[in-house]
């Protein structure tokens, strides 16, 4: 079943969910719109400017959802073999090196989830404007 899952450490709230909830309402609504559409979007349609698929071997399983408002917001995610989306890491891009740091963190999280599947929980995307 396709859906959106989110990385949630056992001892605290899901970092990506907290990040999204803390955004400016207009930008949050834009990001949530893309998250609602994401499970039904074919891989071939995940192209710039709203998405980026990383080509380097180490990051080839990772994608980036891009939203722009007053700031540049990025959400790193992967598509699991069963078609589910797994949101790994979110950040505000201020410098080009921010992406590399986020990718490294996303790879680390992906490894944790592979070893401990219970760290991936269903993410209920709130409807826009709520």
Model-derived features: where do they sit?
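Basic, Lys/Arg-enriched alpha-helical interface segments
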Residues: 1-72, 81-85, 92-130
């Amino acid at each position: 079943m396709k859906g959106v899952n989110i990385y949630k450490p056992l001892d605290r709230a899901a970092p990506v969910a907290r990040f999204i909830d803390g955004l400016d309402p207009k930008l949050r609504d834009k990001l949530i719109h893309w998250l609602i559409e994401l499970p039904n979007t074919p891989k071939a349609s995940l192209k710039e400017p709203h998405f980026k698929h990383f080509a380097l071997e180490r990051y080839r399983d990772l994608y980036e959802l891009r939203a722009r408002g007053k700031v540049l917001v990025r959400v790193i995610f992967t598509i699991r073999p069963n078609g589910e989306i797994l949101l790994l890491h979110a950040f505000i891009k201020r410098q080009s090196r921010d992406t590399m740091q986020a990718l490294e963190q996303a790879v680390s999280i992906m490894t944790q989830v592979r070893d401990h599947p219970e760290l991936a929980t269903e993410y209920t995307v709130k409807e826009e404007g709520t």
